[in-house]
Amino acid sequence: MGKEKVHMNLVVVGHVDAGKSTATGHLIYKCGGIDKRTIEKFEKEAADIGKASFKYAWVLDKLKAERERGITIDIALWKFESPKSVFTIIDAPGHRDFIKNMITGTSQADAAILIIASAQGEFEAGISKDGQTREHALLAFTLGVKQMVVCCNKMDDKTVNYGQERYDEIVKEVSAYIKKVGYNVEKVRFVPISGWQGDNMIEKSEKMPWYKGPTLLEALDMLEPPVRPSDKPLRLPLQDVYKIGGIGTVPVGRVETGVMKPGDVVTFAPANVTTEVKSIEMHHEQLAEATPGDNVGFNVKNVSVKDIRRGNVCGNTKNDPPKEAADFTAQVIILNHPGQIGNGYAPVLDCHTSHIACKFAEIESKIDRRSGKELEKAPKSIKSGDAAIVRMVPQKPMCVEVFNDYAPLGRFAVRDMRQTVAVGIIKAVTKKDGSGGKVTKAAVKASKK
């Protein structure tokens, strides 16, 4: 193996019928962690129900169904490798909570694969005003996914017949659109593919001799490796807190930024509890340090399960510790809300692992979604499609951060009527004074060391 491969998280976006499952399934199928036995089983099942043509998509559908039933599948099934990198598909739309997952998702995507259906009529539908292609590209960019590879899929369709003209037309139109969204078009690679036939997926297609660029796998290999935020102060949102006999209280969560070591004195916000980290475990092994991306359990001294809970954030007491937010200002994009939203609206916000109602205390201005320019000061209300700067007040104690400082704690989904009605990124936070919280004996002792 030699040098460790670069790990990249990918999100797959695009219109509902663009062929995302087939293209993604094909990559996983050809370069992935699915063993031949499983594939043969899927193929037989697909044939039995007369859907043999869906074998690649079927792979993904099976995985999705298992995921939705809450069966955590071996994540290897969602991985595929290239000579340089290991890619994990962290989400593919079509999944009910796709938008919410993209925001509160267990991991930030390092790049997006935008899949476009090249067939006559299909491309037009996807890129039209109501098409999801635009929405997904804008969301990905707003949430900090700055690298993208665009696949012009279905080049084998009879209306396209592997033709260069259609490809050029699509490249021109999509480039103009994603440039408006904010992407640097010079850095975005376009690849004409057939997710079903396999053209230009892994091997160069003989049916498109006019295309001189990379295959999809090569284009993915050319993406810039992500910078993991280990040099930032520690932020670890809690997913759960367990009480384990003979050990004590064990919070569990994923390190988003920074590093945590045994012996560190940490503060939990908004609980405002400070204590010492006794030990850290991952996959039942003791760790000398936990770094970004690690899902860990750690033992804390003199803290009861009642003191801290899911949604709390753990940070280092001596290095910009987390604090409760009194209020915060965010740029909010309304996606689908049936009515007008005015001051006083109080939906639930999903931000990192917290799930708390927040009041739209003051809609300060309506802005242009792309440029951020102010369009209207203090509008009476905002509706679907609008973007606004809003001052928000949590209705219960909550810990959030500015997106530019701690991205995973600075983006949120607004949930109402069982769907994601808006997304936002946090621009500023007014923090409460953290003094006067509970400091355990262990913390005092450790601080003197």
From Swiss-Prot:
Protein's GO biological process: calcium-mediated signaling; microtubule-based process; translation; translational elongation
Lineage top rank: taxon: Eukaryota
Compartment(s): Cytoplasm
PROSITE patterns: G_TR_1 (PS00301), G_TR_2 (PS51722)
GO molecular function: calmodulin binding; GTP binding; GTPase activity; mRNA binding; translation elongation factor activity
Span list, region G1: 14-21
Keywords assigned: Cytoplasm, Elongation factor, GTP-binding, Nucleotide-binding, Phosphoprotein, Protein biosynthesis
InterPro entries reported in the protein's UniProt record: EFTu-like_2 (IPR004161), G_TR_CS (IPR031157), GTP-eEF1A_C (IPR054696), P-loop_NTPase (IPR027417), T_Tr_GTP-bd_dom (IPR000795), TRAFAC_GTPase_members (IPR050100), Transl_B-barrel_sf (IPR009000), Transl_elong_EF1A/Init_IF2_C (IPR009001)
Binding residues for GTP: 14-21, 91-95, 153-156
PTM comment, free text: Phosphatidylethanolamine (PE) is a direct precursor of the ethanolamine-phosphoglycerol (EPG) moiety.
Pfam hit, one: GTP_EFTU
Spans annotated as G3: 91-94
G5: annotated segments: 194-196
Cellular component terms (Gene Ontology): cytoplasm
Function: This protein promotes the GTP-dependent binding of aminoacyl-tRNA to the A-site of ribosomes during protein biosynthesis.
Other known facts: The Kennedy pathway is the major route for phosphatidylethanolamine (PE) synthesis, as shown by reduced levels after using RNAi against the first two enzymes of the Kennedy pathway.
HAMAP family membership: EF_Tu_A (MF_00118_A)
NCBIfam families found in the cross-reference section: EF-1_alpha, PRK12317.1
Family: Belongs to the TRAFAC class translation factor GTPase superfamily. Classic translation factor GTPase family. EF-Tu/EF-1A subfamily.
Name of the featured protein: Elongation factor 1-alpha 1
Organism this protein belongs to: Trypanosoma brucei brucei (strain 927/4 GUTat10.1)
Top-level taxonomy: Eukaryota, Discoba, Euglenozoa, Kinetoplastea, Metakinetoplastina
